Amino acid sequence: MKLSELFNPNEFAARHLSFGDEAALLAAVGEKSMDDFVGNTLPQSIRMPSELDLPEALTEADALAKLKGIASKNVINKSYIGLGYYPTRVPNVILRNVLENPGWYTAYTPYQAEIAQGRLEALLNFQQVCIDLTGFPVAGASLLDEATAAAEAMAMAHRVGKVKSERFFVDARVYPQTLDVMKTRAKYFGFELVVSDFAQADEGEYFGALFQYVGKDGDVQDLQDVIGRLKAKGTIVAVAADIMSLVLLKSPAELGADIALGNTQRFGVPMGFGGPHAAYFAFKDEFKRSAPGRIIGVSKDASGKPALRMALSTREQHIRREKATSNICTAQALLTNLAGMYAVYHGPKGVKRIANRIHTLASVFADALVSDGLKVVHEVFFDTVTVDFGSKEKADQVFAAALESGYNLRRVNNTQVAAAFHETSVYEDLADLYRAFTGKDTFTFADDVKGRLNAELLRQDDILQHPVYNSYHTEHEMLRYLKKLEDRDLAMNRSMISLGSCTMKLNATAEMLPITWTEFSDIHPYAPEAQTAGYRELLADMENSLKAITGFDAISFQPNSGAQGEYSGMLAIRRYQEAQGEAHRNICLIPKSAHGTNPATAAMLGLKVVVVDTDEHGNVNIDDLKAKAEQHRDALSAIMITYPSTHGVYEEGIRDICRIIHENGGQVYMDGANLNAQIGIMQPAEVGADVLHMNLHKTFCIPHGGGGPGMGPIGLKAHLAPFAPGHTLTDTHSASAGQTSVAAAAFGSASILPITWMYLTMMGKQGMEQATRWALLNANYVAKRLSEDYPILYTGKNGRIAHECIVDLRPLKAESGITETDIAKRLMDYGFHAPTVSFPVAGTLMIEPTESESKAELDRFIAALKSIRREVQKVIDGEWPKDDNPLVNAPHTAADITGEWAHPYSREEAVFPLPFVREHKFWPFVNRVDDVYGDRNLVCSCPPMENYED
């Protein structure tokens, strides 16, 4: 054996892919080699002119060691900066059994409720926490961050309000990052933001108002009177409230507000250089059909038992399309679960103890400073002590002394410095900070402390009284509760999830390990730049890789979801055209097959959507595109196009599409949802795209987390780069530094970027190209095998598809009465999550197997769908009645087969339809959920405990 053969830097690619299956898969699709297969699948006109310019792969061990070296360049000071981000303690039982558990982080958004009851219960727990703390009857299952939530509240206020005004009031005490995002959104909604002292809010006519509770500099104001005066005028009032402070303070609902929002980060989610974190959003009942994001509701299943589901989906962007005022899809489910479980584990007494300790430490510190003659700016505060030193020189000295002692403070202005206390603050911190603020080594802190919150501000009602917050306070009980919920969900640690357009690929353990390293997780997003050298190097590495992959000139990492990436890309186009004196360009062409976020995003930017027809092959109708581009030539802003198409085909006319748009004065936005079918074989910038968003949670291995987090960075051509999101508090060292932002943190959900860095580093240039080839091969193998039983709706060159295929169930439905939903639910009995149902074509399933699945797993999935086809035939032949068969009754639970049985099919046919199912049976926890009942009888709070027990 040669010495070089002892070391294989490409070992990870062999873990991510199944090289041993290559010959069999190629033979099944009628090809002799992978090169021949790709050549017969991909149009020659779009092939990359050169190979991928990425480094060679590193082994798992070497990649982890290299990343550890990069991470070590970050400096972990004790953070007292505040501004919505605080050090917290993640309970270890939650860290290990949720955040680090593939049973939680590899699941998808709970569209298939019957196999997501555990996650849905966890999300419902979160909603109940928000309901209890805000005082409102309805809360959603998270938004992307506090700044985005504030912008969503502004849009919702305009939608539901009665005041005929385009002016929105913003409390001057609002976090600067929140105001920055609101400025971005307000401009294209046509709103005027008026920023002023909170007490002056009722001096004008506003359709809505936003107050900060607690203020950015720490003060707590009694907002009840000013809110009352605004309400008398019909203004919709939102309150951005610190989640931990609400444990002690009156709820926003009691203050008279209509909407409450904020960040739940300090409920056990690391700061992570800005994210990901789950924002909460709660509101009055009458606004429930106008609220953004997901809402979990209690319904019932076919047997009449309680069951959970995502409620009121008809108000969401994928239904409302260009009529939507929000493009939010899934948000931050995994972080939502962390925050909700934090409340479950600590319970009401625990969270009160934590909140009281934070407030008491801040009060002790303030009292000591006052007794030493210093001026504490605010008499009433929760956690943040702001001191005015009267001179810039003294403030500089204090700030520097704290920094030298390992503490990051916030510089409020030239003379003021603030220290924000938090869950991890300890007695030694008081001593160190006192020394930095006063220059004295001797100190005495009072043992009996009077808090700084006035009695009239304090909460009088009880919180977290539901049994779920009062039952799991020992670790073994919490561990079992988490395991119980996990076992009710089907995630990728059980079987493949073939959701089309979702790219549910392997989330390798080595990729996940670094996200909990303290060097990445414990950094404040506004920490001094000198302390974030590791993150900056990570970002630079990734920017170079993504530029090489896509062909673009610049990358912005700020968008913290795919929908935000869409918005940011189209925003860059709008800003560019305005800078060119072409603000009048307001027409956006969108193919009929586009995802619902596309028209929703266009509408949010003040664009008028013009739909472009598709032809009989599912491709963009070039003639219709050309006619509409020329018709709107003087007003054409952009086209939003997905490639490969949403129909799973490489459209050969993509260069012509881009050329037609450019010739008529427009820009090309490419939706990167299907980028997994491009890497190493084509580049979006090279075929004509001007901007692209990339789903790191699809193509680049960040897990879907059961509904988030995601990341949607954008790649831009040089002319658009100056118009990407900037940031008001962080120097991004980019051409777009002066622009307003789209997210609260400059680099979005930065702490999950190490996942993608590890994937790129371990795969290397050869592995990344192989991944694309295998994604195509697996998809074509599945399509070929299934075409024996089902029509494949669209194909491209040589009858091939790209990375996903659409199975047409409409003929079968017409003949048998069995619906696409019946087949989706029946797959659960075989142990599989359904593919994407009725998108982009009603009555179909869209299947994307990804490159990660082995032939053995693909064959099991194919066998399940073939078996289901035989079951449908039994209905057609009259062997089973149309109203009583295993498809319409699916899914079947353990309770079904142990109870009375009067069906014309056997128990074995119901739950063990194929031999492989016996080896690893997944039992759905509930029967088919009644969606109509759930929407007509919306309950989005935790039901009584006996419902769980039954």
UniProtKB/Swiss-Prot annotation:
Transmembrane segments: none annotated. The keyword Oxidoreductase applies. Its cofactor is pyridoxal 5'-phosphate. GO terms for molecular function: glycine binding; glycine dehydrogenase (decarboxylating) activity; pyridoxal phosphate binding. Pfam families: GcvP2_C (PF21478), GDC-P (PF02347). It catalyses: N(6)-[(R)-lipoyl]-L-lysyl-[glycine-cleavage complex H protein] + glycine + H(+) = N(6)-[(R)-S(8)-aminomethyldihydrolipoyl]-L-lysyl-[glycine-cleavage complex H protein] + CO2. The modification N6-(pyridoxal phosphate)lysine is found at K698. SUPFAM superfamilies: PLP-dependent transferases. This is Glycine dehydrogenase (decarboxylating). The gene is gcvP.
